[in-house]
């Protein structure tokens, strides 16, 4: 009989899975992106996408989606298939770093708060590596931010991420004024116990 500890988080591509599935240099680079906001190299993104796809397929996933929270108050998803036809009549499973990092849904059906004209319908979903991907049913759900072509926030997550970046920047400035030069990043957290995590 399976215990709760056996299946708790088993469908989440969390730190334990990343550490097990990714080469050490890829894992270290991704952790630097997550913890310090460092830019993500295209080769690292491809390696992460391959590991994420293989893990998802092992758990029965056939599709992936960029999962985001537009201004409608509910979540939205754009589903794509891992499956591509092969020349010999079979199928191959594909998922690239480019597909992981960015999607381009039609933004015309989502509210914009008057930020742009209706004909400026292009919107982008951008992978948020600070939130773990997870499997729901047969779909790998990739948490993303949703922005307009010119960078305006079209969702509820982008303002939160930008606020966290601003808080990190100012908190680091204050800490360095007090002589603490070792802190690289400040992570605000909200929960039963509110605290701020410092990355040294």
Name what the model sees in each region.
Residues 1-5, 193:
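Divalent-metal coordination cores built from histidine and acidic residues
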Residues 4, 8-11, 16-97, 102-117:
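Histidine/acidic residue-rich metal-binding segments in metalloenzymes
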Residues 41-43, 179-189:
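Flexible, glycine/charged-enriched surface loops at secondary-structure junctions
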Residues 36-38, 90-91, 125, 138-144, ...:
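Structural beta-strand/beta-sheet cores of well-ordered domains, especially the beta-sheet scaffolds
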Residues 64, 192-193:
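Buried hydrophobic positions in well-ordered alpha/beta secondary-structure cores of metabolic enzymes
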Residues 196-199:
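Conserved small/polar residues in nucleotide/adenosyl-binding loops
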Residues 46, 58, 161, 165-169, ...:
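Conserved structured core elements
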Residues 115-182:
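Charge-rich interaction surfaces and accessory domains that mediate macromolecular binding and assembly
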